[in-house]
């Protein structure tokens, strides 16, 4: 997933780790997913050159990341029906493609019913209104979140993505996308699968 103003990041990704997809190594495909903004015309022009941008019909804001994530899942189930695995990541993340292929091969069976990445088993809602991750009692009355994988990047099977899309029709909207996906995972009886190869910057 990307933000409209992050063209330099998209170009850097295209010129670095996405080169593997251009050389068809590992049969990997990608798209950048974005919402509507004042830059929609520029994004359409960028896509005319790159043919790798999908625009959703929602405002591209932080509080709409759940819409963006679910759009990406819905798009994958419709346009990637022959895919075995799907990875969701952000435009400020570096993906080591050979490492990703190894991780998928080593965890292929587990990922048939799980989402893998840098996962927390439990976390508490932040009630401070000044926080980027603020959650009101009205939007989330429980004391703890279900376990979740960091939205910076996770991998799973198309089978799991399909199940999440279906169950999302019965899960009320929540603005923190990684928590929302976790709610769908929990309701579906799916699992989290921590993978050591997924590292956040503050993990070092």
Language model: regions and residue ranges:
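Secretory-pathway lumenal glyco-enzymes, predominantly type II signal-anchor Golgi glycosyltransferases
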Residues: 1-204
């Amino acid at each position: 997933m990307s933000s409209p103003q992050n063209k330099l990041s998209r170009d850097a990704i295209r010129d670095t780790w996405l080169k593997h997809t251009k050389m068809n190594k590992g049969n990997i495909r990608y798209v950048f997913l974005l919402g509507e903004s004042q830059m929609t015309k520029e994004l359409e022009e960028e896509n005319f050159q790159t043919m790798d941008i999908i625009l959703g019909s929602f405002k591209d804001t932080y509080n709409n990341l759940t819409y963006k994530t679910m759009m990406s899942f819905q798009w994958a189930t419709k346009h990637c029906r022959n895919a075995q695995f799907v990875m969701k990541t952000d435009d400020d993340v570096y993906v080591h493609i050979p490492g990703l292929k190894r991780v998928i091969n080593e965890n292929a069976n587990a990922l048939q019913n799980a989402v893998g990445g840098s996962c927390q088993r439990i976390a508490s809602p932040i009630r401070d209104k000044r926080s980027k991750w603020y959650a009101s009692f009205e939007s989330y009355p429980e004391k703890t979140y279900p376990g979740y994988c960091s939205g910076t990047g996770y991998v799973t099977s198309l089978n799991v993505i399909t199940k999440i899309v279906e169950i999302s029709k019965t899960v009320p909207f929540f603005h923190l996308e990684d928590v929302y996906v976790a709610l769908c995972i929990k309701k579906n009886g799916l699992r989290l699968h921590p993978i050591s190869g997924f590292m956040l910057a503050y993990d070092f």
